[in-house]
Amino acid sequence: MRGIIEDLSQDGLGVINGIEVPFCYPGDEVRITRTRDRFGRKMASEFSLITPSPLRQRPRCRHYGKCGGCLWQGMKYEEQLKFKKELFRRITGIEAEILGSPRIWEFRNISNFIVSVNGIGLKEFARPKTVVDLKECPVFSNRTPLYIRAMKEFLRESGLKPWNWKEGDVHYLQVREGKFTGEVMVNIIAHRPPEETILEYFPFADSVYWSIKRDKRDDPSGEPIHLGEKEFISEKIFGIKYLLRPGIFFQTNSYALPLLLKAVEGFLDGSKVLDLYSGIGTFSLYLTKKGFNVVGVEINKTAVEVAKLSAELNSLNVEFKAKRAEEENIEGYDALILDPPRKGLGEFAGVVEKKGPENVVYVSCNPKRFILDFKNYLSRSYKVEDAILIDMFPHTPHVEAVIKLRKYS
């Protein structure tokens, strides 16, 4: 079959006659020779690009087209922003301005490299058990080859075995960089006790951890053991030092984070704010510095401990509670910030709908879940007053949305 890509799917794949084509964009002329089913839809598994779309740019990464990390790296950045805005509108029905990332290369502050028998890197697109053996990663760091080379040397000389999807010793190499501090944290995620010799292979790291993984799930989780150098590294945003360590979440784009913080601040009314799913205090610390009276609530006890340490380090008076969002009394506040995980609020949205304050700011990287929460629950009491999109994820279809909700009079 031969034809021209006419649109993009909600997941950012090119579409022609109902067939999804990865790494292709509207205006591309393609020839499809084989398809397969993926998530109940037809996807081209073998195809060739005949005539490129004018939307295209030369991708910077040699792994583009295989690695699943950057589906849109072959598209001009200004076009990426237009499509993100359009896809958000299609999914939610909301028109929103979009702010691009100040940097679109080497912006990611963390990467989880799979340590596999096939190499060290990221998953191949649509092939979850095939790892692309990375030689570079321009969206993460120009030091990526250094990190991967050090890991390979350690494996070779220690005799430890990489993960083969069923067994092995070492599963992930997690590297975190403080983009504004220059600090580096290395976290080895393994299915065995730590090897102290690992420190010899990462002399450039400001902090080294070894996390023991006791399950076979394909995620970079484990029980962290601090091996050497500093216990924390930090990132500095608006003069605030955010402490970072394994087992916590921090927004992955340090350069676009100031835009996100300002967007949330701009949508808040009043001064007494409840920050649910507050993590390490990303919003709470900034807003406290700006004069708001903030209470942060987070289920992850490690994240709460780190948030408290960061507050102390920055001389900020903010209260953090280690509990489920559902357990907190949300009444008596001027504004409520909701920044739930990708799965959204679920039934807790019903509690917000009944007891939430006049002003709610919902932060979401998953517009499909936001609109479910809104339509099923929040829309009974709230209307969308404003929204803004922040591109935290250049070269992917993903976008961070900040939505201001107002209670009906």
UniProtKB/Swiss-Prot annotation:
Keywords on record: 4Fe-4S, Iron, Iron-sulfur, Metal-binding, Methyltransferase, rRNA processing, S-adenosyl-L-methionine, Transferase
Single Gene Ontology BP annotation: rRNA methylation
Entry annotation: catalytic residues: C365 (nucleophile)
Keyword Lipid metabolism annotated: no
Gene3D superfamilies assigned to the protein according to its UniProt record, in alphabetical order: 2.40.50.1070, Nucleic acid-binding proteins, Vaccinia Virus protein VP39
Binding, [4Fe-4S] cluster: C61, C67, C70, C137
InterPro entries associated with the record: MeTrfase_TrmA_AS (IPR030390), MeTrfase_TrmA_CS (IPR030391), NA-bd_OB-fold (IPR012340), RUMT_ARLMC_TRAM_dom (IPR048845), SAM-dependent_MTases_sf (IPR029063), U5_MeTrfase_fam (IPR010280)
Reactions accelerated catalytically: uridine(747) in 23S rRNA + S-adenosyl-L-methionine = 5-methyluridine(747) in 23S rRNA + S-adenosyl-L-homocysteine + H(+)
GO molecular function: 4 iron, 4 sulfur cluster binding; metal ion binding; rRNA (uridine-C5-)-methyltransferase activity
E.C. numbers: 2.1.1.189
Pfam families referenced in this protein's UniProt entry, alphabetically: PabTrmU54_TRAM_dom, tRNA_U5-meth_tr
Binding site for S-adenosyl-L-methionine: Q251, Y277, E298, D339
Similarity section: Belongs to the class I-like SAM-binding methyltransferase superfamily. RNA M5U methyltransferase family.
Main function: Catalyzes the formation of 5-methyl-uridine at position equivalent to 747 (m5U747) in 23S rRNA.
Name this protein carries in UniProt: 23S rRNA (uracil(747)-C(5))-methyltransferase
Species assigned in the record: Pyrococcus furiosus (strain ATCC 43587 / DSM 3638 / JCM 8422 / Vc1)
